[in-house]
Amino acid sequence: MTAKDILFDSDARAKLKVGVDKLANAVKVTLGPAGRNVLIDKKFGAPTSTKDGVTVAKEIELSDPFENMGAQMVREVASKTSDVAGDGTTTATVLAQAIYREGLKNVAAGARPIDLKRGIDRAVKEVVQELRNISRSISGKKEIAQVGTISANNDPVIGDLIADAMDKVGKDGVITVEEAKGMDTELKVVEGMQFDRGYLSPYFVTNSETMDAELEDPLILIYDKKISNMKELLPILEKSAQSGRPLLIISEDIEGEALATIVVNKLRGTLRVCAVKAPGFGDRRKAMLEDIAILTGGTVISEEKGYKLENATISYLGQAGRVTVDKDNTTIVEGKGGAEEIKARINEIKGQVEKSTSDYDTEKLQERLAKLSGGVAVLNIGASTEVEMKEKKARVEDALHATRAAVQEGIVVGGGVALIRAIKGLDRAIADNEDQKTGIEIIRRALEEPLRQIVANTGTTDGAVVLERVKAGTGDFGFNARTEQYENLVEAGVVDPTKVTRSALENAASVASILLTTEAAITDVKEEKSDMPAMPPGGMGGMGGMY
């Protein structure tokens, strides 16, 4: 077992703080409309330029293992916030740093860490409730565009593009982001369907960067039973291989020998194939497989209908323009089914919706309807260089995620002002002792930090002056860092999704509390590399310079 290095008490917390500060200081320069870019060196290719907090956080790995632990804990704040809400990663990092910094001061002064944590937890609960109280729902295209613009680092073109996409396929419709062949960024709506089943094996992946399996112009086998015997599957595999087109297999499951054989042939390059489980369960699964068959112009191979897998021919297979499969979802784009058949199926489902007496059944039927009729909106992102395209694509994906969050939970005033307005929720927080009261005050101070940092990044205005003026105001009044004017921020389009602000605070408080209550830190002892003496030239002694 490797030897361990252990630090205790204030020594451990001090080292962790150095790591927290190093990461947070690199991330927080990107906050707000006046935030700066961070340049990240890559082992291969050109450096990456980004203004996305989580991208910066993910690149940071420190040489000191204790400092690195602190940095990785805060990186978790940014990653979790990005996963849940799509934006707010820099805000979350700034909040985590502020809570930890203020908490450490009080721990050093003799406060009990566990009571500080309880106070912080109670304070966060009340602030989150206050954020919900001041949140407002969004519906209009203009409001959706505003959220998209802010989340895409104040790029109105991206905001408008996302609003158009949501307008065309609905707020719950499927929207994907792809790299364009040229320089133009455009929206394209294509008929398609997405269901929540990913690939059965990561060996099916064709794009290792995105971990997707991408099949162009594939054939689609739709089978309603498990496939465990390779003999059943072999005839149709041979026929699809002869056609030269990739194959998507949708079945209840593929087990053992059959899956292993498919994977081996995929790795050898004999087959271009991907396998996924069928969506849904029971009767709903049968209906969804039928939907896929109608959309792609295929036939569900079902023994109930008298079809057997070993007798299947190419004519039974569905077809599509493209299929993308990740670990969680399968998206079928440009199904080659007949327009009349698809329309008839849509009308049939609409009839079932009208007759349905169960809310759950109605919801599931409407989901199927959206998948058949809503289509997929594809945002093709163009740019002059690959570096710019990757950065822009990442911003669009973040903005799309954040816009969906805004549709779910509504919006609050942006620019760090919502957290200032939510401070009044702390008046409801009840403390059992002085240390818990201190925990509540730590949150009161930390909630001011995002606004201070937004102002600091402008480089022209005193943060303390702005903070006092914003505190003196009410409602949507705040400081617009883009124009450096005091105004109604909602009317100026400066808004944040409530979910983003809430997630940032909850995740920051969670990780900062763990760090505050840490009493020991353990890492592996670094092994010293021994310097081997170089062999003298001319071979070994007595060997006459043999080489």
UniProtKB/Swiss-Prot annotation:
Reaction equations catalysed: ATP + H2O + a folded polypeptide = ADP + phosphate + an unfolded polypeptide
Family per record: Belongs to the chaperonin (HSP60) family.
UniProt protein name: Chaperonin GroEL
Subcellular location: Cytoplasm
Protein's UniProt keywords contain Isomerase: yes
Function: Together with its co-chaperonin GroES, plays an essential role in assisting protein folding. The GroEL-GroES system forms a nano-cage that allows encapsulation of the non-native substrate proteins and provides a physical environment optimized to promote and accelerate protein folding.
One biological process term in Gene Ontology: protein refolding
Organism of derivation: Pelodictyon phaeoclathratiforme (strain DSM 5477 / BU-1)
